[in-house]
Regions:
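Cysteine endopeptidase catalytic domains of the caspase/legumain-like
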Residues: 1-281
């Protein structure tokens, strides 16, 4: 089993401000529910750290929390942020970590999350936040989703496959932005457009993914972060909402998985009405 770390960060802002996004914690709940599911990587509770809920948080506190992620002992790390973000005057993306004041916005450059200068880092960063020139409200909420049909899959086997895909990749960093630079990330009636689109993709495609795994000789199916980006772009740009962005830092021929499914291979494959073969481990 490889050494993994997942940090889930939320910052709704100041409760007294008009742009307070009270549902960021619920959004984080739903991100965690997906990642703990078999196809989301079957992450264990002890591998997950939640940061920022109910307390004022600061960039230095997050940097201390990230120390284990920036060591060679960490084989793979994932960072998810839901809250307020912006593009600074010098064109750098940043997230807002603590409850801000007029005197101090306490912005943390996104660059500080990427492990730059550390060639051993394998990391995915997902930022569901604005990238406009000033921080702007974007409610972050996943609509409650039905994952029951995919939870029946064996999490242990999926986790092993997920780990193998991670270690096949060269050390690199993948970044998913919910919107393009200088643009806002919009909310919906029930949450954020980006998070809703992601969750809908999982819900609508899970049966198709399972069918692909059933028909694979080894019982495997994977769907990369790049695949997710393409589907998110198709949905959000097609509806003229916002344009997600995806970047890779470093060189690799293999991308990190968003979904990894491994079904038992002790099963019978059918071709229409005819039994084709029986597969064994």
């Amino acid at each position: 089993m490889i050494n993994r770390h997942l940090i889930l960060i939320s910052n709704p802002g100041n409760p007294n401000d008009e742009n307070y996004a009270k549902t960021t914690e619920e959004a984080i709940d739903r991100w965690e529910a997906f990642f703990r599911s078999p196809i989301g990587g079957n992450w264990k509770r002890e591998e997950i750290t939640r940061f920022g809920e109910g307390n004022t948080i600061d960039p230095q506190g997050l940097k201390r929390l990230m120390i284990p992620l920036n060591t060679v002992q960490c084989n793979y790390s994932k960072i998810v942020f839901c809250g307020h973000g912006c593009c600074t005057a010098d064109e750098e993306d940043a997230i807002q970590l603590p409850i801000p004041t007029k005197e101090n916005n306490n912005l943390l450059p996104v660059e500080d999350l990427l492990g730059k200068g550390m060639p051993f880092v394998r990391r995915t960063v997902i930022l569901d936040a604005c990238r406009s020139l000033i921080p702007y409200t974007s409610k972050q909420l996943f609509e409650e989703r039905q994952y029951s049909s995919i939870y029946a899959i064996d999490g242990i086997e999926c986790r092993k496959y997920y780990d193998s895909l991670i270690m096949e990749a060269e050390p690199h960093v993948e970044i998913l932005y919910s919107t393009e630079k200088h643009h806002k990330a919009y909310g919906s009636e029930d949450g954020s457009q980006y998070a809703d689109a992601m969750s809908n993709i999982v819900r609508m495609k899970s049966l198709y993914w399972k069918a692909r795994a059933i028909n694979d000789r080894y019982g495997h199916f994977s769907y990369s972060m790049c695949d997710l980006q393409k589907d998110l772009t198709s949905v959000l740009v097609g509806k003229n909402i916002q344009t997600p962005e995806y970047k890779i830092l470093g060189k690799t021929d293999t991308l990190f998985p968003f979904v990894a499914m491994h079904l038992p291979t002790e099963r019978t494959l059918y071709n229409e009405d005819a039994v084709v073969e029986v597969l064994e481990r």
